Design a protein with these regions (language model features):
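Catalytic cores of the polymerase beta-like nucleotidyltransferase superfamily
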Residues: 1-262
């Protein structure tokens, strides 16, 4: 599994078990409005995984080629959060539908402190301790430093936008990298995630060492998914966790705390 991403395997509606009747009506509203405005709209991450497992998702995340500012213009009930990782939150009473723009591939660089509010690639929503409202009027949407890693490979800043073919490589586990397409109700699978979900197997997208260096908290997340969903951790992933568990000492305490509460 190496970049660039291959064309996705498109699984038609009659070959998977996800139904619109299982999806939050508010998530459907977001998806259809994006589609009607000419944008792509996909459910992505943990919600697709859970629906395939016959579980009720705790939230629904959307990925799109619309920029955060474009999402905000489509929804009066939308707020942009995070300067270092920009997300759109669309509010429907107590329910929040999170909308993220497709991300591009990593570009190593030196930078500042690691992100505490890392991206929603994990399939469980972003790790945001104190969401920061984003002022779209003064922000640079795609500066040359829009994706920055530190000397250890940890993600520092992540606003490099791309396509769905790029976005899949930014996600953590294959089980969290399935995209439900509202246009034809198909599932797009780039990395064998559908088979892994059905087999309850946890595999990392790409090289486990690289992905754990980018975000050491992924190691805790792997253990949580294995316990919560009764998944078996792939042997190379398990070996990398044993080898690089010391990297957790460099993770922001707030993110470690948040992960232990899930």
């Amino acid at each position: 599994m190496e970049s660039p991403a291959p064309l996705a395997r498109v699984v038609p509606r009659d070959q998977h078990t996800v139904s619109r009747s299982q999806i939050s009506p508010n998530a459907l509203r977001v998806l259809y409005r994006l589609k009607d405005a000419g944008f792509q709209g996909f459910l992505v991450g943990g919600c697709v995984r859970d629906l395939l497992l016959g579980l009720r998702p705790k939230d629904f995340d959307v990925a799109t080629n619309a920029l955060p500012e474009e999402v905000k213009r489509l929804f009066r009930n939308c707020r942009l959060i995070g300067r270092r990782f920009r997300l759109a939150h669309v509010f429907f009473g107590a329910e929040i539908i999170e909308v993220a723009t497709f991300r591009a591939a990593s570009a190593p660089a030196l930078g500042e402190e690691p992100l505490a509010d890392l991206d929603p690639e994990e399939g469980e929503g972003p790790e945001i301790s104190e969401p920061e409202e984003f002022d779209a009027d003064i922000a640079d949407t795609e500066g040359e430093d829009s994706h920055v890693l530190d000397m250890h490979g940890r993600i520092l800043r992540d606003n490099a936008y791309g396509t769905i073919d790029d976005d899949v490589w930014r996600r953590d586990f294959t089980a969290n990298a399935l995209y439900y397409n509202i246009a034809d109700f198909s599932i797009w699978d780039y990395v064998g995630g559908l088979e892994d979900v059905l087999a309850r197997r946890l595999r990392v997208i790409g090289d486990p060492e690289t992905r754990f260096r980018e975000d050491p908290v992924r190691m805790l997340r792997a253990a949580r998914f294995a316990a919560k969903l009764d998944f078996t951790i792939d042997p190379p992933v398990e070996a990398a966790i044993h080898a690089f568990s010391g990297l957790l000492a460099s993770a922001p305490p707030a993110r470690l705390f948040d992960e232990t509460l899930k």
